């Protein structure tokens, strides 16, 4: 474990470097240093929830500097606009291995104006996406990025899209909801993003059919435990702790928040705030949060180990790798995931 005073000094120096004047090229060049510092900080004993929040905070700072620098270079239209963080970035739950999920919202008074404004924003958004990729944030394979015309929209266009997803949900709509409904204003006119969230919650609270479909969709992820409560491995003798671990808590937190009208997008805050609203016992809430945090910690530890070995860091964990205590806690954490799914079945009559 690194010396705490050394870590503090590195962190202070890095924050100063991130705040110092410089070109977008200078900012991108800081990315490896940010990543190295984060590996050391996370390895110093932080729990999973605190570690992913710390990673997201540093990534936010780097991203905002890139956006602000490029906004000064481009001829942007004189309208209110905001860069939206989506998915794990929106939730403040990023791990070391992450790609981009983002969008852009702007103000326009008509569809014709929206088309004209979008044409001016797209070159800027596309360069931001590319510079973020240069800094280590991989381009989204599903093209959910602000540089895609489909996700560079006026407020009215976003509103119509959200209404379509909630009122007439299809499989693709449910998939999009798992990314876009975790939106967080990151840079610019935050009130545009907050107003969009207000609209979203007003619809989801009043649409039980959508809540039911979201809950049913979340239950498709099967907790990797045998009937006897032992770890169930895939054909590679691994467990995908993202798809069949942390995602279960993320999906459940989102559903509970959209049902209760909770504004938070962070999973822990959603589980605690929405859980209180719907009457989840405090002990049950604490168990869910502790389990989620432990699974995140294991994912981060696996990514660090694979990065040190110069391998590709994925979400799969070979359960023989953790200490016996970690293995036992993983089993208990997955049992909490199963209990959370049972809670969804009960609440939504599934």
Sequence positions of predicted segments:
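N-terminal regions immediately upstream of nucleotidyltransferase
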Residues: 1-67, 71-74
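Catalytic metal-binding acidic patch
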Residues: 91-119
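Short gly/ser-rich loop at a beta-strand->alpha-helix junction or flexible surface loop bordering the NTP-binding
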Residues: 80-87
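Alpha-helical scaffolding flanking metal-ion-dependent phosphate/phosphodiester catalytic sites
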Residues: 161, 167-182, 248-257, 296-301
